[in-house]
Amino acid sequence: MQTYFDQLDRVRYEGPKSTNPLAFRHYNPDELVLGKRMEDHLRFAACYWHTFCWNGADMFGVGSFDRPWQQPGDALEMAKRKADVAFEFFHKLNVPYYCFHDVDVSPEGASLKEYSNNFARMVEVLAEKQQQSGVKLLWGTANCFTNPRYGAGAATNPDPEVFSWAATQVVTAMNATHQLGGENYVLWGGREGYETLLNTDLRQEREQLGRLLQLVVEHKHKIGFKGTLLIEPKPQEPTKHQYDYDASTVYGFLKQFGLEKEIKLNIEANHATLAGHSFHHEIATAIALGLFGSVDANRGDPQLGWDTDQFPNRVEEDALVMYEIFKAGGFTTGGLNFDAKVRRQSTDKYDLFYGHIGAMDTMAVSLKVAARMIEDGELDKRVARRYAGWNGELGQQILNGQMTLSDIAQYAAQHQLAPQHRSGQQEQLENLVNHYLFDK
């Protein structure tokens, strides 16, 4: 078979002194970190959509990329050609996983019948590619936001026929994910929100979205899918306000519909930025709420109000993210999917490799910094000492419901409590983190 990336055999680890731009300097899949292979900690995935579907177009210009599989021709044949290039890329990049939306891998067609037939054929192609390459599916999902029919949302659409079309896509994509051995299924509500409250019934739309999620959970159990269901929070774009705004908002939504034990979160760094949060905050919040599942690893631009989907390159924040994930026990079914794209001016086909290689090295360094933090344990000890009082008699009686509000007030009066503020020592802790980051 003719190769597309014909100037490259495979990206390999060459060590930190390497000057080869098509080699890893820090990501060594077999290196042991806290007793586990680096590849097994990080569980990298490359995404289909930004890497093979985007043509370089933006709001002010047409596509700038020359991708042979995006040329005019038979749609199904172009999809197969795209799959050839995609799996060549996955293999040469040395990623163990990939992710897709339904219409990333298969032509949508002009009807539901065409959609289903095309997707069924491409699932056969993908299954064969997976078997040949050893690359596995981290997660699949359905694109229920691009087609004009979804202008007013999919699950939250005022037309139940649109809801039904979306439900068909979701059930088909879930079945495909299950058939391909996918380890998760993602729900991202690209247009599940509103642009103006003047024509929006908030209660109605929340009920519709909640019902779709309940149906998804029911179908998961019906088909015996053992993977994890994930929601990917995002505050806005393309709508003004989305119902899955951030980790905390999604938790409240899931609680409302009794789904908090059925669905977890896929946290994206850039979406955290858009919500006014740090990536670290959203990961820590998801873990605290028992909802952490997987990560879309990228970065946004704090000076821009949209999803820039750049490759991660900030070890300072990503190390803290990996530290939180380490403390939570690491990934189970989730992983680090690079929901990132090269810039519109990056028109060389090997730019796809440069972006992913830099991102993988960044996350590898972040992993090793986080491991140093875990091994040293000082940051954890500082936090434990700060809350130590809650492990004492008073703290435990309050938390365990053994004291009423009046009991607590009586205790404070009887013991003449006069507590004094203790320093949070933020500056010292920031210096400690810098020690892990920069001291060898």
UniProtKB/Swiss-Prot annotation:
Lineage, uppermost ranks: Bacteria, Pseudomonadati, Pseudomonadota, Gammaproteobacteria, Enterobacterales
Superkingdom, taxonomy of origin: Bacteria
Localization: Cytoplasm
Keywords: Carbohydrate metabolism, Cytoplasm, Isomerase, Magnesium, Metal-binding, Xylose metabolism
Active site positions, chain numbering: H101, D104
Any single biological process term in GO: D-xylose metabolic process
Protein name as catalogued: Xylose isomerase
Gene this protein is translated from: xylA
Cofactor(s) the protein needs: Mg(2+)
